[in-house]
Amino acid sequence: MSPHDAVAHAHTSTTTSPVAVSHPLDALTAAEITAGRAILEAAELVTETTRFPNVLPIEPEREAVAGFREGDPIERRLLFVLLDTATGRSAEAIVSVTAGEVVDHRELNTAEAPYGQPQYLFEEYARAEEIAKA
């Protein structure tokens, strides 16, 4: 699957229209994010309780950007932070939407130093307010 293909999202009947990426440092498109999620789903890394606190572009090497010429192929990789809201487990996955594959996946150990966890989800703000006021 190419990031420029139209992708049907599994939870809706909407099909995205791809926006052409013309430079390695272009912002992520909705089609790329949707394609990345589809790749993670195909790799069985997403459940109904999985949320994505962060989806970030992985910038290409400086040399690739400096040597880029219009029309050159563009490798697009995304870093997804996955949070299972049912279990609290967290992971990071690097997805190549160009190659249509998960390049790397690792569980995050939030119980050992250097302690950390994914950022708050928007859905958690109201819940945090309720807890604080209780």
Can you say where each PLM-predicted feature lies in the sequence?
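Short intrinsically disordered, low-complexity segments
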Residues: 10-16, 40, 59, 79, ...
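Exposed beta-strand-loop-beta-strand "reactive/processing" segments of non-cytosolic proteins
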Residues: 47-98
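Residue-identity detector for threonine
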Residues: 12-16, 29, 34, 47-50, ...
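Short, non-transmembrane alpha-helical segments in secretory-pathway proteins
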Residues: 24-66, 122-134
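Long, charged/polar, surface-exposed segments that mediate recognition or autoinhibition
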Residues: 103-134
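Intrinsically disordered, low-structural-confidence terminal and linker regions
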Residues: 1-32
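Interaction-mediating elements
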Residues: 17-24, 35, 39, 73-77, ...
